[in-house]
């Protein structure tokens, strides 16, 4: 009997990625390990930045926000996915599905804007170092971070209620491991073309505008680095910027694939793999790419872990 015939109270069924794998138990253990690493590493980074006064700078303020987003990101999807697999129960309530969708859109929108704000921070630090403390004051950083969270919240509030209001009479089986908008829309038996146009326009704003800000910022950064006489200064600037560019490429590449490419280029399997990459792998990679190879962070970590030996 199909899962859709067992639906009670309008519940959905997350078919997930485990049905595609010959050894789901091993994949479940792997995902749980990744989840634990992502949670522990991001919490550690947040604590480091909070405790160590030398990390109280605009750059680490934004990294702190990024870690908070990544921590919430992976917590929205992975626990439910693992519980469903272990309990052999693929159901998710309509409320639970809508909650997943909202937080996913909110966090995704906030991260899009935050990565642009981080690029602007690097632009000011490298191109206008003498005015850095004024242009990137604590008040400015708070305004930028608050704006990122606000834009993400607006994105979630606009798209989620409309998506969940469509009638789902074809099936309640979601070909995904969480309630992502494109996967849920495929179940609707009504015309969703207008909503898809609206969502596409939102993606243009949330993806292409930040990408433009990042591209322009790095254009001027590269020009400034090229003019630097100090080899050490160039190396430090390139190291900082390369970390950010790596994070940007990983996140925006997967997001643009999922939300902006024509549906003819996409399949449920490819969509799940793309979403798996930037909802599960990215939160565990970001602390490594952006911070734990940074000398300031490693020094702060050693300082936090150091234990005073009692005198004998």
UniProtKB/Swiss-Prot annotation:
The chain crosses the membrane at residues 26-49, 58-79, 101-120, 140-158, 196-219, 237-259, 273-292. Disulfide bonds join 97-189. GO terms for cellular component: plasma membrane. Pfam families: 7tm_4. GO terms for molecular function: G protein-coupled receptor activity; olfactory receptor activity. Residues 1-25, 80-100, 159-195, 260-272 are extracellular. Glycans are attached at residue 5. Keywords: Cell membrane, Disulfide bond, G-protein coupled receptor, Glycoprotein, Membrane, Olfaction, Receptor, Sensory transduction, Transducer, Transmembrane, Transmembrane helix. Residues 50-57, 121-139, 220-236, 293-312 are cytoplasmic. GO terms for biological process: detection of chemical stimulus involved in sensory perception of smell. It is found in: Cell membrane. It is a multi-pass membrane protein. Odorant receptor. PANTHER family: OLFACTORY RECEPTOR (PTHR26453). Belongs to the G-protein coupled receptor 1 family. This is Olfactory receptor 2T10.
């Amino acid at each position: 009997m199909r899962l859709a015939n067992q639906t009670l109270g309008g519940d959905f069924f997350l078919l997930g990625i485990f049905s595609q794998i010959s050894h789901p138990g091993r994949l479940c253990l792997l995902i749980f390990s990744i989840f634990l690493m992502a949670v522990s590493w991001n919490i550690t980074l947040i604590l480091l930045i909070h405790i160590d006064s030398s990390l109280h700078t605009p750059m680490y303020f934004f990294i702190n926000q990024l870690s908070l987003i990544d921590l919430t990101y992976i917590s929205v999807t992975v626990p439910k996915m693992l519980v469903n697999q272990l309990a052999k129960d693929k159901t998710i309530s309509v409320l639970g599905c809508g909650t997943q969708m909202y937080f996913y859109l909110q966090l995704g929108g906030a991260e899009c804007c935050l990565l642009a704000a981080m690029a602007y921070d690097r632009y000011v630090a490298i191109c206008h170092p003498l005015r850095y403390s004024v242009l990137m004051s604590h008040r400015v950083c708070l305004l930028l971070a608050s704006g990122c969270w606000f834009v993400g919240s607006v994105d979630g509030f606009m798209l989620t209620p409309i998506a969940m209001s469509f009638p789902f009479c074809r099936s309640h089986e979601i070909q995904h491991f969480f309630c992502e908008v494109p996967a849920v829309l495929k179940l609707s038996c009504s015309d969703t073309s207008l909503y898809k146009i609206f969502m596409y326009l939102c993606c243009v704003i949330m993806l292409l505008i930040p990408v433009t800000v990042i591209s322009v910022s790095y254009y001027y950064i590269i020009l400034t680095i090229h003019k630097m006489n100090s080899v050490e200064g160039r190396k430090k600037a390139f190291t900082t910027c390369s970390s950010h560019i790596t994070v940007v490429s990983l996140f925006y590449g997967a997001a643009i694939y999922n939300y902006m490419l024509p549906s003819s280029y996409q399949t449920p399997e490819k969509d799940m793999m793309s979403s798996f990459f930037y909802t599960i792998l990215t939160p565990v990679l970001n602390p490594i790419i952006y911070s734990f190879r940074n000398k300031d962070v490693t020094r702060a970590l050693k300082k936090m872990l150091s234990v005073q030996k009692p005198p004998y």
